Amino acid sequence: MRKILAAIDGSEHAWKALDLAADMAKQHGAQLIVLHVVPFEPLSEALREFAVAEHLRVEEELARFRYARTLGDHLTRSAEARVRDKGLTDVVGRTTEGKPADQVLEVARSEGVDMIVMGSRGLSDARALFLGSVSHKVANHAGCTCVTVK
């Protein structure tokens, strides 16, 4: 095993997944890629046209996104420090934007990872019932082994 991807979102399950991924990377001498995805979807054409009349709200959304990006960068750095404290030296942290499952799959493909480790989540909220969970989509579409951690 050469590369392990740990997808994190700051949840308790994600921290457990990160710890497991770090232990596995250390055991196998693998590189650990720590990935946080800031959820973001570009506006559709219709929404962009509508936004002209709602300029202030769009600015507020952009400010929230910038704040989320800053928090995501901090989360990634904290995760890197956590695994380095465990003695792991080959660690790469990345923060990206987009649909979380799509970004995890894209980074896994582009980096040629051998395993993806992520926290599991129950499908208790209404959004998950309609959209499906990130871990479920990743597990069903990844070209490598996926481990979900509770």
Spans of features found by a protein language model:
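Short, acidic/small-residue loops that bind anionic groups at enzyme active sites
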Residues: 141-150
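Short secondary-structure boundary segments
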Residues: 36-37, 119-121, 150
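Charged, low-complexity cytosolic intrinsically disordered regulatory segments
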Residues: 41-116
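Glycine-rich, Arg-bearing micro-motifs that act as flexible, cationic patches
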Residues: 109-110, 115-140
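Small/aliphatic-rich secondary-structure junction motif
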Residues: 2-59, 86
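General small-molecule cofactor/ligand-binding pocket signal
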Residues: 35, 92-96, 147
